[in-house]
Amino acid sequence: MTTNFPAFPPELLQGCRNALIDYMKIQAGNQVVILNELGSAVDPFVVHCLATVIQEIGADPHILWTSKLAKGWWQELSPVVRAAIGHADVVVQNISSIGKTHMLDLMLEKKVRRFRNYASDFATMTSDWARFPVEVQDYLERKVNTMLIEAGTYRVVSDDGTDISGEISKRLTAWRRDLKRSGGMNVSFPPSVFRASESLNANGVMMVYSTYPWGARRVGLPEIRFQNPVKLVVENNYVVHIEGGWEAELYRKLFEEQAAAIGQRSYYVDSWHSGASPRAFVPFDPRVDPDRFDHLAHNHECWFHFHLGGLSNKEGSKTQIVEHINAVCMNPTVYLGGQKVWEKGHLTIWNEPELREIASKYGDPNVMFAPRPIWE
């Protein structure tokens, strides 16, 4: 039997099939736009494999290359690109500068399903992270997201001095009602972050080790990691004091710049979340591409971070407000409703017998759930 499909390494095919069939659940007849940004870490060989798997499913791939957005969140997406997305059933977005912000209205109004793909390079798409079984990930997300909905309160503590407690808002928006991401309208891959939980009435201290690289370089902060943590004091859900080494003064500038756009809301503790994978990794020195480092590291279970500003102030189908500052608190212990759910950056659920039994169908749970170092 002959085939017109080119030969791909089995690990690459497994990763792409896991992505598009198991996680995104693309169906025969779907019109699928594969969106790529020129000059980003997108391997055309991986794109070709994704398109081949889409054809294998019986769907129609349409590969589109466009320019990076130099101003990121603050720049509009090309109307040509938006038109292509608006006529698709699914957009497979090989992530770089374009975000959900630029297409949220298309997702909500035209029901375009978005697949946010971080595995756009060969090393990531062939990794155990990209080949992680969806059945195991679904179990994890259902369990933790149910806890997040039902908990009511949270507390985040760390050995370096973070200790902050607050309430979890019960408000659920259209794009975060599902208990799992697979098959949904906004799927992140490989296993990515838990959806952000909105904070209320928080009080305490955060020790912050990094922020978004694209924000850091605007004011002269280290793009990857601060030399000295910045201490934020929070009262009634607002940052009221910023202190630390030389980084503290520059970090304060981010709040001041943001306040020019959204006022006092700049200091508001909007929400928080972490990655959901112990196997997330960065296949290069972070200094090579700090933005991509942040995109990938964001998905690790130890990468716990707060959004400070106006991220969750959304209404209806309008594009979300994107004015927020990232505050990364590494390897914390997190309690939901008094129950320990993360311990020093590692999810406690990995020890549950039922989850381990499911995982044993695919491999050794001790290997699958072992945290890969991402911050040393």
Segments (PLM) and residue ranges:
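Active-site bordering "gate/hinge" segments
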Residues: 1-229, 235, 268, 336-340, ...
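Short conserved micro-motifs at the rims of enzyme active sites and ligand-binding pockets
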Residues: 218-219, 244-245, 283-286, 317-319, ...
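Dual-mode signal for accessory low-complexity, basic/Gly-rich regions
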Residues: 225-226, 241-242, 246-309, 363-374
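A conserved acidic, glycine/proline-rich C-terminal tail/linker
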Residues: 295, 304-325
